[in-house]
UniProtKB/Swiss-Prot annotation:
The keyword Transport applies. This is ATP synthase subunit alpha. ATP binds at G169, D170, R171, Q172, T173, G174, K175, T176. One of its GO terms (molecular function) is ADP binding. Produces ATP from ADP in the presence of a proton gradient across the membrane. The alpha chain is a regulatory subunit. It comes from Ralstonia nicotianae (strain ATCC BAA-1114 / GMI1000) (Ralstonia solanacearum).
Amino acid sequence: MQLNPSEISDLIKTRIEGLKAGADAKNTGTVISVTDGICRIHGLSGVMQGEMLEFPGNTFGLALNLERDSVGAVVLGDYEHISEGNEVKCTGRILEVPVGPELLGRVVNALGQPIDGKGPINAKKTDVIEKVAPGVIARQSVSQPVQTGLKSIDAMVPIGRGQRELIIGDRQTGKTAVAVDAIINQKGKGIFCVYVAIGQKASTIANVVRKLEEHGALEYTIVVAAAASDSAAMQYLSAYAGCTMGEYFRDRGEDALIVYDDLTKQAWAYRQVSLLLRRPPGREAYPGDVFYLHSRLLERAARVNAEHIEKITNGEVKGKTGSLTALPVIETQAGDVSAFVPTNVISITDGQIFLETDLFNAGIRPAINAGISVSRVGGAAQTKVVKKLSGGIRTDLAQYRELAAFAQFASDLDEATRKQLERGRRVTELLKQPQYQPLQVWQLAASLYAANNGFLDNVDVKDILAFEKGLHDQLKTKYADLINRIEDTKDLSKDDEAALRAAIEDFKKSAAF
């Protein structure tokens, strides 16, 4: 059988002419109104909740409200060029962000697009920003520590890998400082970090990035920035985008730490979006699902077992557990932790670090209130040496604060009470720490040992920090073997304890502080 070329071309022409190329009416719609980054769209009867929509000018949006005859969507980015009557298309995709080691050292927005001027990010993978948290069977108990390098946290409210530890306090109490110090201290510890800045001034975010760079911490950190000038939708989505980037490491048998700074502003952004979408307001004008907003985010931070990782990586990674540790930050108003969002997040997390304005103003920094700061699961993850030595510190501090309040009214104090007050003053002074100077485990062990065994009792309160610095310097120069043993074993054997005691006694005799 011979084919005639002209017949074939005629057949193709006929087919092309008869082709109906019009888009399916289900998947296109028309903009009815656009206000404050919220679009109402007529049509789109086939759209899914959370689906990406394509607007003119290569702009995308997110379908959030599915109503009987219209769809409410938030525009991701500029919306000034969108006008009534514009056509909108469904994309059939859920919002995804790039993930992987290519993002380390970069500053990106809530959509994973670089905003640091260092060129494009060639990430090999993308992942959806909304994911279901690992189930009970996939999880493993928290048993390894995350060292923050801050004496008061590592000793009194220890954090474990896979834990959610809330940092809560009024504005200007050092919440970001605690989180940034924790990131800086992960250098060389194999923990990847994600810092999510939500609703902060661009200058503040730039300052944090500069500090991370100065301390060599940016190389293992991803910064997700949704500044105060960005739209409410971007501020609301940035936390989920950062979480997905952190989960990439968790699901490959690595350890990651994520800081959400702060979730109060994310709740405000979500409230704004919800009210503009005409959703019914509840307590403090927040929508009804504001608890779910934070619980579905924070439940994704977990320690997962080797079977879960093997299943996710299709057998590529075997015999490794992974973790994502979350440090959410909440800003309170005048220390009111019983407000709506603070109580929600306190009930979701595994403990909280409470920072107080009065302590901060009194020069006690980090301004951690030892009485109401707790870590519900971190104790199991604390290093042996710190666990041994830190038991007395918390009790000393709590009793000191209580006694100090009574001592104001009492003129004649008995000897035991006076001693306890003196010890408390010294412990309070010892737990002060300058910013960007995290301590290693051996330094913390030496400081705690000196406090517990009365070596500070005859040192003037004003000289405590100088004493501590001098002790650390002498241990570093004269007792390197002891330091290495403590760092390697993370424990204090009887011999090492005797050596440490002798070293401190030797230092006190020299009085080199």
